[in-house]
Amino acid sequence: MKYELSQSISQRGIGEKDAENQRIAEIADELRRRSQVYEAKSGAGQEHVSHFDAEQRSAELYAKEKGMWIPMDEVFDLGLPGASGNENDIYTREDTVFKVNNLLNSGSIVNLLEKVILHNSIFPDTFYYFIGFAGYDRRSVMPVLQQDLVKDAQPATPIEIETYMAAIGFTKKNYEGRFANNMYEVWDLVPRNVLKDKDGDIYVVDAEIKRL
């Protein structure tokens, strides 16, 4: 495989997490810039290219330049397939979970990366690292994220989720699994996305987030 998986799995401290958030932001900025250039060049010709397609091709080229491209036939090398959701295919290796994201909820790579940064700020215990992009040449490109595995976990109950979110300063809204404070709105906090370990600690492993 062309990407450095062993390095991505190594232990990281708070300073390294700050650096990772900065790296993700820089990747998002670069993809935004490249997509605009790609669209402009395509617009000068006869073939119209959508923003989504421009972003996809820009991400593929960027990943191949940076050694972050994961061919789809190598995705199973990430780990053992696990229970997948609407947006993520899950692979587990030792203490690590890899998520191959199909962008169903976020709609674009840049949107997803920006959401990852927000998640990392609000829920640092389930910090996401960006590994690279998986896909077939000139077809769908999917970001690959890494998260620590929550061991011996079970789904948290709605009451446990509400109690946890209140403890970190969020108020429950009118809809189930939706919370907000004066900076962020977080939703889809349902039991499948929030886990409780054997010590009773709560972990938000997946959430939809927007800045207010």
Residue ranges, per PLM feature:
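Catalytic activation segment of kinase domains across protein kinase-like and atypical kinase folds
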Residues: 102, 178-212
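Juxta-kinase regulatory segment immediately upstream of eukaryotic protein kinase catalytic domains
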Residues: 1-76
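ATP-binding glycine-rich loop module of kinase domains
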Residues: 45-50, 73-125
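C-terminal effector/catalytic modules and regulatory tails appended to multi-domain proteins
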Residues: 3-4, 11, 15, 41-43, ...
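Catalytic micro-motifs at enzyme active sites that drive phosphoryl/nucleotidyl and oxygen chemistry
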Residues: 76-81, 87, 131-136, 176-183, ...
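Conserved structural core of kinase catalytic domains
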Residues: 102-104, 120-176
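Short hydrophobic-acidic sequence motifs that mark active-site Asp/Glu residues
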Residues: 87, 97-99, 144-146, 186, ...
